[in-house]
Amino acid sequence: CPGSEHYDPSELEAFYHYKSNPNVLTSLEFERILSASGPTMGHLVRPSDEKEPKKIAWLQCVGSRDTNRCGNGYCSSVCCMYAIKDAMIAKEHAEGDLECTIFNMDIRTFGKDYEKYYLRAKEKAGVRFEKARIHTIDEVGKNKDLRIRYMDRNGELQEEFYDIVVLSVGLQVPASTAELAKRLDVDLDKYNFAMTQPFAPVETTRPGV
């Protein structure tokens, strides 16, 4: 199994400011902050000044379901649920009130009891789900706060300010997979996944593999 790797948002630096602003994190980096074995031993602070955040935004489908900017048109299938989980854990770790907003095209909760988990986050934990398209992300002031401008579901342009922005990065096939497939004589599709048939989803183009 060739495994997977997460999408590198630095490819879209002009839009996300991932490299230039320390308060823009990938989902994996944010999970390290929440971890007891992480750099802050589980204490929720933002990287730029080590202050506790009051507002955190998650941006879904970074590197997935996007053929205009990154070319990955598929859903990675894990990003929605790990964003919900991280938002709930962040609220548990916060010493004060913490506003968590997940900006999304839609929430895909297709696994067993995933919908219940989503509703628990929304109705009991107070996680806010905003169905919207992100227009721009800007750094505001010397303290490196972030302004998100977005189009809401009514088609109106809104803007909000956040202490941390978490990029829910999708998964993609490692570059080394192409060489492996060539050696095995297995055909790949345009996303470098093994090419299969609709009624034989685990059979490759090479018999017996």
Task: Name the predicted role of every residue range.
Residues 1-209:
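Residues forming the flavin
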